[in-house]
Amino acid sequence: MKLRNLAVVFCAASALLAACGTDDDTGANSNAGAGSGGRNSAGTGGGRAGGANTAGKGGSAGVDTTAGAAGEAGNPGTAGDGGSGGEGGAGPISATFTVTLENVAPTKSLTSTGVFNTPVGDLAAGPAAPGKTYKFTVDAGRKQKLFFATMLAATNDLFFAPNGDGIPLYLENGTPITADVTSQVYLWDAGTELNEEPFVGANTVTNQGTVNTGTVDTNTKVRKIGTVTEGFVFAYPAVAAMIKVTVSHTTGTLFEVTIDDLSTAALTTGDLVSHPLPLSPGVWAVSSAANALFTDQLPAPAHGLEALAEDGKPATLSTYLATNAGITYPASPGAWLLHKTGSKPLFTSGAKDLGKGLEAIAEDGNPAPLGASLASLDGYLTGGIFNQPVGSATAGPIPPGSMYQFTFDASPGDSLSFASMLAATNDVFFGPKDLGIPLFDADNLALTGDISSQVYLWDAGTEGNEEPSIGPNTVTNQLAANTGTAGEGKVQLLSAVTTDTYSYPSAQSVLKVTIAVK
């Protein structure tokens, strides 16, 4: 009996000492130390067991964790150690994500190009003599211009071409033209060979023994013949007395271009002999950019203009132009949002557009309406717009070589959705599937790296598709925003649009999407 009383006294003293100790120390009897757990890590186990018939206190939870289980009771009559408390559960996981949208598409300086080399009625390629005609057809949008070049044969390096602005194929109100455009054509000196008297000089194209011969011009700039004072100065007839150029709209966005070598085209040399003036085969190009073939008052580009202007040979220039022809696809400003996994905030594949602003991005590259609607979208957690390219002081689309970035915090159960227009189209946009991209896997590991394979080209179904970069209602050619014919009526993968026979790039060939996590 005395021994039992001593044991009780001893236990009471021990309890008092434990109460004065630190929170995480082990305590005797019922005052077991509490287990602690940091954020994102398990709490430690409980303290030592309590006294007889008393369960040890469970380990307390770490920050945002689950408390450990209580310790087991000691044996009756014995101040044995109680069971240890269980470990606290893991705290919630969070990470900071930076998303980069980079335009990796090639840049094309021309929309299309070609060669004209066979006069109408002839069976073989060759120059056009007076009375003969070259014809070719171009496909062009409202913002695109016509360029061409053909040599004035019997000279050293003279050629006919429009100036650097090209020839507009539409009026300002969008009406396609049918007109005589000769007044927009000039006679140019390529600046690559010193001028001699036409038809007489030893290195003029009709007299030279081989191609690319003659004296180097002392002025190497491309310039209009009326300003040339170097070499043999000759009074050439007016352009309209030598050739006639007409453009005729045929249908849709197609135009037929006719270059007539006038039957009266001739010049008289110093020996008072009148010579007919043939035209050489040439090249044509359609572009929305200026100076598609050359730049006035700059040296001729080293990609074939010299061979055309000196020898009437378009092959080298044609090959160069062909490698630079195609469509340049910018990506537009857009909107992004973080949302609960399982929600479909921006659209549902196969269903009509929600009317929350996706149409404005898909048709016009305008993220403002969708940005203003984000908080009302299904599963919305946070979001915003991206409209300023990295390194730029102003908002705008990203051409090839540029990128957008945006940053946010996310936790398991969160997904990412975004939309950005494939510019040069009617209503095509980049985006993940309608459920978005989950940002954590089943083990709560954050998604990182290149996620381009999870991004697709979608058709918003709000506007009928036309030929990219050419159609009158594509974003680069439309006269006003939100114009065009009715669309398919549902959001769907672009590849699923059966009424569209035009060619498009893959999403990954234009937009590279990566995620960095910290």
Give a label for each model feature.
Residues A7-V8, S41, G62, A496, ...:
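Detector for intrinsically disordered, low-structure N-terminal pre-sequences
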Residues A15-P92:
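Ser/Thr-rich, Pro/Gly/Ala-heavy low-complexity intrinsically disordered linkers and tails
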Residues G27, G312-A315, G365, G484, ...:
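Glycine-centered secondary-structure boundary/capping sites
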Residues I93-T178, T251-L254, S263-D434:
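Structured domain cores in non-transmembrane regions
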